[in-house]
A protein has these predicted regions:
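Boundary detector for helix-to-coil junctions that initiate low-complexity/charged tails
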Residues: 1-39
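N-proximal low-complexity "stem/linker" segments adjacent to membrane-targeting elements
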Residues: 24-79
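Short beta-strand/loop segment that forms part of the nucleotide-sugar
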Residues: 88-97, 122-123
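Active-site-proximal specificity loops/subdomain of glycosyltransferases
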Residues: 101-148
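Short beta-strand-to-loop acidic/aromatic patch adjacent to the donor-nucleotide binding site
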Residues: 147-158
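Conserved catalytic core of nucleotide-sugar-dependent glycosyltransferases
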Residues: 160-250
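C-terminal catalytic/acceptor-binding lobe
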Residues: 243-327
Length: 327
């Protein structure tokens, strides 16, 4: 009888959580309609593709928990970084390695990257805690004023120089309304690109949105902003590092974060839930032209972990063609 009552109580609490989420969504939707909209300019979206906006110098941290089978995947990310025409400084954080494994890792890096550092962390209780060690690297890098930007990547994420250029340009445009340009993570499968992190389509009239005057272009705020990386300028990183978002328990006070992100994922998305403007789910917004997501905001997930597993497909992940994501 006692177990039966506990199960009933658990289901009630779960239902309350779902109701709370719906209420929050409704408040955001109504506020979005009543508040005056910030109007972007059409020329912003034309200008961003005419020129490459480069960082002065970028510190990059890749989180790589060593597995020999993942070296090929890591190499794809390294190849992309090696193609950048601006000044980079790469740090790879990993677990404690055998000598032969460290040689293999060094071989991949040395072949493509001039300046890099491998930092090994011993006695990790679990591989999910490795990303949190990136904080110590970023705290060290921010002290050096020569760095203008900072990027954290999981080992299977491919970010192009065009992605970085777009972010730098729109960071300045969106800064005065406390929003941050986001990326959409996709997997290429059978000649098509599929969204990885959105189990549902992003509906324009159900999510916070900012239009240009013509309403041809704009930014939309998704409830599912995760992309397995972050890019920050000095101001963003400083604010992040001194905030409560760098604590593992930060998500405990946020029902959305608690339901969406395990410990490993929290480190590269928690900043999006700091100081969120009134009518938004989070601070990250995604660009669109009509109902199309521009190529410059699409990043690649080189390891096909979402489009193939049926268990994830049943939940909606890895099933939505990027062309149909915004409706």
């Amino acid at each position: 009888m006692y177990i039966f009552l506990l199960e009933k109580f658990r289901k009630i609490l779960k239902s309350i959580g779902k109701i709370e989420t719906k209420i929050i969504d409704n408040i955001i939707h109504r506020t979005d309609k009543t508040e005056k909209q910030y109007i972007l300019k059409d020329y912003h979206f034309r200008r961003v593709i005419k020129k490459e906006y480069e960082p002065r110098k970028i510190a990059i941290v890749i989180c790589f928990y060593f597995r020999r089978g993942k070296l090929k995947t890591l190499n794809k990310s390294i190849l992309e970084i090696a193609s950048y025409n601006f000044n980079t400084d790469l740090t790879v954080i990993t677990n404690d390695l055998k000598k032969e494994d460290e040689l293999k890792l060094n071989k991949i890096l040395k072949k493509r990257i001039k300046k890099y550092l491998i930092i090994k962390f011993k006695d990790l209780p679990d591989e999910n805690f490795l990303p949190w060690h990136s904080l110590s690297v970023m705290r060290s890098k921010i002290k050096d004023s020569s760095y203008s930007h900072f990027m954290y990547l999981e080992d299977d994420i491919i970010v192009s120089s065009k992605n970085i250029s777009y972010w730098i340009y729109f960071r300045k445009v969106l800064k005065n309304i406390n929003l941050i340009p986001n990326f959409i993570r996709c997997e290429a499968y059978k000649g098509k690109l599929f969204s990885v992190d959105n189990p549902k389509k992003i509906i324009k009239n159900k999510n916070p949105i900012i239009f240009t005057e013509s309403k041809k272009f704009g930014f939309i705020n998704s409830k599912y902003p995760y992309s397995a990386m972050y890019l920050m300028d000095r101001e963003l990183l400083k604010n992040f590092l001194k905030s409560k978002a760098t604590k593992i328990d930060f998500s405990f006070s946020n029902s959305v974060m608690k339901s969406l992100y395990p410990i490993k994922e929290l480190i590269n998305i928690s900043y999006a839930y700091l100081d969120v403007p009134k009518r938004y789910h989070n601070r990250l917004v995604l660009p669109f032209e009509k109902n199309t997501i521009p190529e410059y905001s699409i990043i690649k997930h080189s390891d096909l972990k979402y489009v193939k597993p049926k268990s994830l497909n049943k939940m909606g992940y890895g099933t939505i063609n990027i062309k149909n994501l915004i409706a």
